[in-house]
């Protein structure tokens, strides 16, 4: 069975890197620029680079926001990346706009720490909190690439799939609920570890996308 992937194009995503990563794994994705484009896709990727409020405004301009909320409420497959993860939450300290609210909780600025810089930029190992379609606790510890100044704080800790150390705290690196998940890091820029995660996600989709509870 063929898989129809869509990458949401709202002017703030690293579409080229995501597209190339999918191509290396033998998949093609169409750009989703408005509600009509959703009719032809089975699974979505919401990438994002930049700031929260401009991203929400750009999404609103596409007319996609109510449709993405419906997509999430119907538990259809969606993967957020970096800012894409933050947009799935209810709000962010970075701005005043409402997020998509597919995950309960808020996005908060990273706390300053003597041995860490903001933005948190570079490679870091993940701690697996629960198994999900991208990551399994039996996997070797993956090192992945981060660039962020804010991190999500889920209201329900059961959606935490992975964390990463920042200073003396563990910050959200991945969330998952049902068929909807997101990474704060960039799997498309995380070399073999990131490619393995995307490959596992694609395999999960091809196998019917069993929800994770």
From Swiss-Prot:
One of its GO terms (molecular function) is imidazoleglycerol-phosphate synthase activity. GO terms for cellular component: cytoplasm. The active site is at 82 (nucleophile), 186, 188. InterPro entries: Class_I_gatase-like (IPR029062), GATASE (IPR017926), Imidazole-glycPsynth_HisH (IPR010139). Its EC number is 4.3.2.10, 3.5.1.2. It is found in: Cytoplasm. It catalyses: 5-[(5-phospho-1-deoxy-D-ribulos-1-ylimino)methylamino]-1-(5-phospho-beta-D-ribosyl)imidazole-4-carboxamide + L-glutamine = D-erythro-1-(imidazol-4-yl)glycerol 3-phosphate + 5-amino-1-(5-phospho-beta-D-ribosyl)imidazole-4-carboxamide + L-glutamate + H(+); L-glutamine + H2O = L-glutamate + NH4(+). Pathway: Amino-acid biosynthesis; L-histidine biosynthesis; L-histidine from 5-phospho-alpha-D-ribose 1-diphosphate: step 5/9. GO terms for biological process: L-histidine biosynthetic process. PROSITE patterns: GATASE_TYPE_1. Pfam families: GATase. Transmembrane segments: none annotated. Residues 4-211 form the Glutamine amidotransferase type-1 domain. Keywords: Amino-acid biosynthesis, Cytoplasm, Glutamine amidotransferase, Histidine biosynthesis, Hydrolase, Lyase. Coiled coil: none annotated. Its main location: cytoplasm. NCBIfam families: IMP_synth_hisH (TIGR01855). Heterodimer of HisH and HisF. IGPS catalyzes the conversion of PRFAR and glutamine to IGP, AICAR and glutamate. The HisH subunit catalyzes the hydrolysis of glutamine to glutamate and ammonia as part of the synthesis of IGP and AICAR. The resulting ammonia molecule is channeled to the active site of HisF. This is Imidazole glycerol phosphate synthase subunit HisH. The lineage of its organism: Bacteria, Bacillati, Cyanobacteriota, Cyanophyceae, Synechococcales. The gene is hisH.
């Amino acid at each position: 069975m063929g898989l129809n992937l869509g990458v949401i194009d709202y002017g703030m995503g690293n579409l080229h890197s995501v597209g190339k990563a999918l191509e290396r794994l033998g998949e093609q994705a169409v750009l989703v620029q408005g509600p009509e484009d959703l009719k032809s896709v089975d699974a979505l990727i919401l990438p994002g680079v930049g700031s929260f409020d401009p991203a929400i405004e750009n999404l609103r301009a596409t007319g996609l926001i109510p449709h993405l909320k419906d997509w999430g409420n119907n538990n259809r497959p969606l993967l957020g990346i970096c800012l894409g993860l933050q947009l799935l939450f209810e709000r962010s300290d970075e701005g005043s706009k409402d997020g998509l609210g597919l995950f309960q909780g808020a996005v908060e600025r990273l706390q300053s720490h003597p041995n860490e810089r903001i933005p948190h930029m570079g490679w870091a190992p993940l701690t697996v909190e629960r198994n999900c379609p991208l990551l399994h606790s039996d996997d070797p510890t993956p090192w992945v690439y981060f660039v962020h100044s804010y991190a999500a704080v889920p209201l329900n800790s059961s959606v935490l799939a992975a964390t990463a150390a920042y200073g003396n705290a563990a910050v959200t690196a991945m969330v998952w609920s049902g068929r909807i998940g997101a990474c704060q890091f960039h799997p498309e820029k995380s070399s073999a570890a990131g490619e393995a995660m995307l490959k596992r996600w694609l395999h999960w989709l091809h196998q019917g996308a069993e929800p994770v509870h």
